[in-house]
Amino acid sequence: MADSRIPYVNRPSVVLPALVLAGIIGFFGLHGTGGEWLDFQVQSWFWNGSDWLIPKDAGWFHRLTYDGPKAGLILFAVGLLWAIAFPARSPAWLGRRRAVFLFVSMAAIALTCTQLRDVTQMATPRALKVYGAVAPNAWEHLLLFDAKPVGYPSNAFPAGHASGGFALLSLAFAWGTPSVRLRGVLIGCLYGGAMGLYQIARGEHFLSHTLATAAIAWLVAAILARWMKPAGVSLTS
């Protein structure tokens, strides 16, 4: 039975994550869908009229909850590089091929999200007049497909910080066992979701930014899994 699953897990659907991403973009990027209302509704949970639930400079708390998860991802990436360079000294359940896939996928997801931010021209909640931003760095909230004035920010969509956490969705494509794949989905969603929620509570992102990031991570990981086929190898490959 294990072998019969290999062809399927090495050909994960790219249509489904692409459709989910398109749905998110359409729902939040167009007027009249309710997406803009939902974004503002979620932000209202963290905005008290004068500041965000988590201030921009939260001292040690920020270092722990913002830098901590990033440090964990860096350590994981270093571990993957070790497994790639020294597979004989690495856990047998990982193997070089899976380590290469995970490293490449995580890097590609983070790079894709950060590069897209430069062209989508979306502002963070902190940069909006409605949330107390002060001129000349104060803007109206414009949706993805709205025409933007010169100088409009382009540093929010998709979410860069959460992309590192959602990149762990790659774990779901590295093994063929259903229970392990489910574990990968949970790890990626929880890690990325926590990182995204923290940024929402700081006024650095809307819900839409975070959801789009998760969908992009899913799509990129699926594309790379079809190409690299990490699940179609033995535990020690």
What are these model-predicted stretches?
Residues 2-80, 118-125, 135-136:
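N-terminal transmembrane-helix/juxtamembrane module of multi-pass inner/ER membrane proteins
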Residues 95-177:
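Membrane-interface loops
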